[in-house]
């Protein structure tokens, strides 16, 4: 096996503790020692990934595949929403009051708070 891909929620991170267990850290470490590249694969955008603790991995596929980066910073894939589409969407949300969240590689933005985003 050359590579292994792991989801975060319920796979690497416990639904009960919201943390990565020591046994998971140890197992991932052993994979890497055996020469297996370890990747995180998640639907979350990077700003929402904050609970991996001391887990070491080689790369991350985030935002449902829109962003793929190695831990050394190498960008493998980065799909951006076209600026004109983003402007049309924000105008629509302003005209029809609704919350929408956007995320970049470094930050997330919410146009207005609602119970869904609090």
Predicted features by range, described:
Residues 20-21:
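A short acidic/small-residue loop/turn micro-motif
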Residues 2-17, 42:
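Asp-based phosphoryl-transfer active-site loop
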Residues 25-117:
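Active-site phosphate-binding/coordination module
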């Amino acid at each position: 096996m050359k590579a292994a891909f792991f989801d975060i929620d319920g796979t690497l991170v416990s639904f009960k503790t919201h943390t990565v267990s020591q046994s998971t850290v140890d197992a991932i470490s052993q994979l890497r020692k055996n020469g297996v590249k370890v990747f995180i694969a998640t639907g979350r955008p990077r700003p929402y990934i904050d609970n991996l603790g001391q887990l070491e991995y080689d790369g991350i596929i985030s935002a449902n595949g829109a962003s793929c980066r190695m831990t050394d910073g190498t960008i493998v894939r980065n799909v951006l929403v076209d600026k004109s589409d983003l402007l049309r969407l924000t105008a629509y949300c302003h005209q029809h009051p609704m919350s929408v969240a956007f995320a970049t590689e470094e930050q997330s933005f919410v146009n207005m708070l609602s119970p869904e985003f609090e």
